[in-house]
């Protein structure tokens, strides 16, 4: 992937939602919400504090994360839809 976010920004790939129910019914795209779960694919160097020191991010590449439903900006890199957001928009890391 040819993208490196700046400062405290993170690039996330959304996980795919299931398109069928447990009984086999197909759910149309218009009836589903965008998932608020994803995998971190790139991270910035960190945020600078008042002294100019860089504070490292808590998330790393490969972390599975939860984020606010409308967080981030959707971008397209190498034909893939990704989200770029600030680390503060991530609400949890899934272990």
UniProtKB/Swiss-Prot annotation:
Q: Name one GO biological process term.
A: chaperone cofactor-dependent protein refolding
Q: Output the Gene Ontology cellular-component terms.
A: cytoplasm
Q: Which domain of life is it from?
A: Bacteria
Query: Which GO terms of the molecular function aspect are on file?
Result: ATP binding; metal ion binding; protein folding chaperone; protein-folding chaperone binding; unfolded protein binding
Keyword Cytoplasm listed? The answer is yes
Which subcellular locations apply to this protein?
Cytoplasm
Q: Which Gene3D superfamilies match?
A: GroES chaperonin
Task: Give any Pfam family that matches.
Answer: Cpn10
Q: Which UniProt keywords apply?
A: Chaperone, Cytoplasm
Cited function: Together with the chaperonin GroEL, plays an essential role in assisting protein folding. The GroEL-GroES system forms a nano-cage that allows encapsulation of the non-native substrate proteins and provides a physical environment optimized to promote and accelerate protein folding. GroES binds to the apical surface of the GroEL ring, thereby capping the opening of the GroEL channel.
Q: How the protein assembles, per its UniProt entry?
A: Heptamer of 7 subunits arranged in a ring. Interacts with the chaperonin GroEL.
The record's family statement is:
Belongs to the GroES chaperonin family.
Could you tell me which PANTHER family the record lists for this protein? 10 KDA HEAT SHOCK PROTEIN, CO-CHAPERONIN GROES
Provide the protein name.
Answer: Co-chaperonin GroES
State the organism named in the record: Vesicomyosocius okutanii subsp. Calyptogena okutanii (strain HA)
Instruction: List the gene name.
Output: groES
